[in-house]
């Protein structure tokens, strides 16, 4: 079986979708499947196309069906699909789901976001994380809060420093922003904070290993997204033992669990940080709860799910 995993972004760009593409390709190859990654569909022979992004993958899927009429299509939904493009009524994206042989989501809650008529085709495959050898080693001082991810409006990347800036009494707190400003507005905002707030440090885009090591030195990492399919940065922090404070959205709950205590709602970040700084919260408990969920996101578990899905598709194709 030949499988093409198509990303909506060039594979040279360090984005969540490209990381996902590379991970799936490696998983499939580990199962003996001839898999490759590409920027959209590359036109080469394939039995199955795994297309990331229902909306941005429309043209690639169309091209695949024209060139490989007997091929099967799996659409892997992203957070942008589920919480932005599809709810806003993307007809092309919805039709892509109707036409797909299978639809993959990374968490159960996502199924409720989809039209009833396509739900029977949905398979839940939690995204995995390769083992990370780096362990949390927070600095004694300052109390560093890491914010990891390329700044985009849906991630509310500057919410943490905006909150800290309202509290001059938090003298020992620093905010470490890790991620490349991909647009002029984000770069400008980051530079402005760097100039006016001495407790803010923007490291820009870093190689993954450097980003992980820096996050490991922080006392806390914050994910403040408005919408998120499931952040790699949250899984990475969990694996390293860095406490996670996260916005209460489906994407974060799908990773950390509904009963995880480290969530904040609208207007609650000040209070949560104050409780942490005052040591009224035991962050060690958060770490233990998060790490207990890591087996759900093991490479072995994800590999088994993908193999089962592809085997089922291959079997059904053989019955036609």
Features from the language model and the residues they span:
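A charged, aromatic-enriched C-terminal amphipathic alpha-helix characteristic of glycosyltransferases
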Residues: 16, 281-315
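Short alpha-helical donor nucleotide-sugar binding micro-motif in glycosyltransferases
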Residues: 97, 205-206, 213-218
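A short, active-site helix/loop in glycosyltransferases that binds the activated sugar's phosphate group
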Residues: 98-122, 126-132
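Conserved donor-binding/catalytic core segment of Leloir-type glycosyltransferases
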Residues: 136-166, 175-178
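Nucleotide-activated donor-binding/catalytic signature segment of Leloir-type glycosyltransferases, i.e.
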Residues: 188-209
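Short hydrophobic beta-strand element within catalytic cores of glycosyltransferases
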Residues: 243-246
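Conserved acidic donor-binding segment of nucleotide-sugar-dependent glycosyltransferases
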Residues: 258-268, 275-281
């Amino acid at each position: 079986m030949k499988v093409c995993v198509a990303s909506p972004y060039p594979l040279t760009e360090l984005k969540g979708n490209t990381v996902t593409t590379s991970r799936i390709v490696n998983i499939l190859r580990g199962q003996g499947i001839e898999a490759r990654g590409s920027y959209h569909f590359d036109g080469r022979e394939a039995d199955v196309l795994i297309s990331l992004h229902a909306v941005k993958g429309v043209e690639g899927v169309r091209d695949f069906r024209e060139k490989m009429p007997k091929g099967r299509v799996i659409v892997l939904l992203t957070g942008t699909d589920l919480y932005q493009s599809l709810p806003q009524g993307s007809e092309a994206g919805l039709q892509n789901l109707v036409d797909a042989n299978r639809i993959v989501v990374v968490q159960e809650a996502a199924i409720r976001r989809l039209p009833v008529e396509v739900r029977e085709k949905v398979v839940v495959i939690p995204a995995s994380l390769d083992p990370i050898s780096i362990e949390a080693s927070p600095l004694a001082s300052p109390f560093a809060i890491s914010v990891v991810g390329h700044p985009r409006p849906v991630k509310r990347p500057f919410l943490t420093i905006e909150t800290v800036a309202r509290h001059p009494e938090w003298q020992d707190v620093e905010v470490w922003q890790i991620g490349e400003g991909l647009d002029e507005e984000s770069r400008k905002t980051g530079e402005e904070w760097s100039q006016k707030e001495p407790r803010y440090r923007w490291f820009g885009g870093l190689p993954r290993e450097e980003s992980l090591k820096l996050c490991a030195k922080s006392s806390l990492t914050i994910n403040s997204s408005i919408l998120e399919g499931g952040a790699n940065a949250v899984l990475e922090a969990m694996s390293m033992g860095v406490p996670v404070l996260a916005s209460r959205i489906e994407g974060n709950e799908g990773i950390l669990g509904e009963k995880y205590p480290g969530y904040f709602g609208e207007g609650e970040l000040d209070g949560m940080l104050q409780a942490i700084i005052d040591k009224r919260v035991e962050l060690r408990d958060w770490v233990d709860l998060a790490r207990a969920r890591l087996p759900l996101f093991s490479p072995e578990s994800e590999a088994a799910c993908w193999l089962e899905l592809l085997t089922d598709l291959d079997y059904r194709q053989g019955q036609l």
